[in-house]
A protein has these predicted regions:
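Low-complexity "stalk/linker" and mucin-like segments enriched in Ser/Thr/Pro/Ala/Gly
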Residues: 90, 205-283
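Extracellular acidic, Ser/Thr/Pro-rich low-complexity tracts
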Residues: 63-65, 174-177, 188-195, 226-229, ...
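C-terminal edge beta-strand
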Residues: 309-316
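Short tyrosine-centred short linear motifs in exposed loops/low-complexity segments
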Residues: 53, 108-113, 179-182, 281, ...
Length: 318
């Protein structure tokens, strides 16, 4: 399956659209937290124009559950129209906010048309409407801010940022039996080093009660920003994009969704520190499947601001 890469774009999203995105995040945070039983909100993240005159529409979603992972096959309960029902959307929905999960390229004459993504999960039907409204125009800075790069801050350098590159081993088998480990190999690199690496580390100063309050461990510090902050620097993970069975990865992969709880194995989770980048950029993992079927496993690389991915289609036999 071809990769979808968040790359160069032009234009600046208006303040109104950016504030809308922040309000959605704030509203979600203000609601009562649920472990399971809630719905999933499809999200239109924005658009930009490509050099050839076509447009890229960006989509993500908000799973209102903190623990429940939902599988919704493409069809009446998960469709994008017109032109669907299958337009590359996920069928596995991981918890909480998952930003910029897939893209749809529309022609230069798309005009005032719109795409509608309808999603029903846990008996709740929600929709998002994608169009070329100017208040949804995004650029690299907008994307970086919304995913939490530099704690949701801004940097002029990000306009020159390019996403990491991802490559899969094309010679590896893509067919396996239930319970049989499958080796997956990928290479990921961040060639430009933008944004520069940061760490959500901890610096403690053992001087008096006031200093202790100021420098207390981030695990016990309430959030002070609407957008969850993340480390800058190369990170890589495999995750299930489509498929209804459980997949176990060894080693365990860091989360690709915004889990901001302390010690949650997530780049948005304090005091998480990104693992060292292999010198050769090679990442190797084994995946074990507990049910037969066809799976799409996504190899996702990010630098804290932009993402690239490649998909591996795996056939699992009984």
């Amino acid at each position: 399956m071809a990769s979808r890469v968040t790359t160069a774009g032009r234009g600046v999203r208006t303040l109104g659209a950016l504030c809308l995105g922040l309000l959605v995040t704030a509203s979600a945070a203000a609601q009562s937290s649920y472990s399971r039983g809630q719905g999933v909100w499809p999200a239109f993240e924005g658009w930009w124009q490509n050099d050839d005159g076509t447009y890229t529409l960006f989509f993500g979603y908000m799973n209102d559950n903190w623990e429940q992972v939902l599988d919704v096959p493409v069809g009446p309960l998960n469709n994008i129209e017109p032109g669907g029902p299958d337009q590359g959307q996920p069928t596995r929905f991981h918890p909480r906010r998952n930003l910029f999960r897939f893209e749809i390229v529309v022609p230069a004459d798309f005009g005032d048309k719109e795409l509608v993504w309808t999603l029903t999960a846990n008996g709740q039907t929600n929709r998002t409407y994608a169009s070329l409204r100017t208040d949804y125009l995004v650029d690299k800075q907008t994307i970086a801010t919304e995913v939490g790069a530099n704690r949701g801050g801004v940097s002029q350098d990000w306009q020159w940022n390019e996403p990491p590159t991802v490559r899969l081993d094309a010679d590896e088998p893509r067919r396996v039996k239930v319970g049989e480990p499958l080796t997956l190999t990928a290479w990921a690199r961040d060639e430009d080093g933008i944004p520069s690496s940061t760490k959500m580390g901890v610096t403690l100063r053992p001087q008096g009660p006031r200093s202790a309050r100021r420098d207390r461990h981030p695990a016990y510090t309430p959030p002070r920003q609407i957008v969850p902050g993340t480390n800058n620097g190369l990170r890589f993970s495999w995750y299930v994009y489509r498929g209804e069975g459980e997949v176990s990865f060894d080693p365990v992969q860091m989360k690709t969704w915004q889990d901001s709880r302390p010690y949650a194995n997530s780049p948005w989770s304090p005091p998480f520190v990104l693992p060292p980048v292999p010198e050769d950029g090679k990442y190797e993992v084994t995946a074990t499947f507990d049910e037969p079927g066809t799976y799409v496993l996504r190899a996702l690389a990010g630098d804290g601001a932009l993402f690239s991915w490649q998909d591996a289609i795996i056939t699992v036999d009984p």
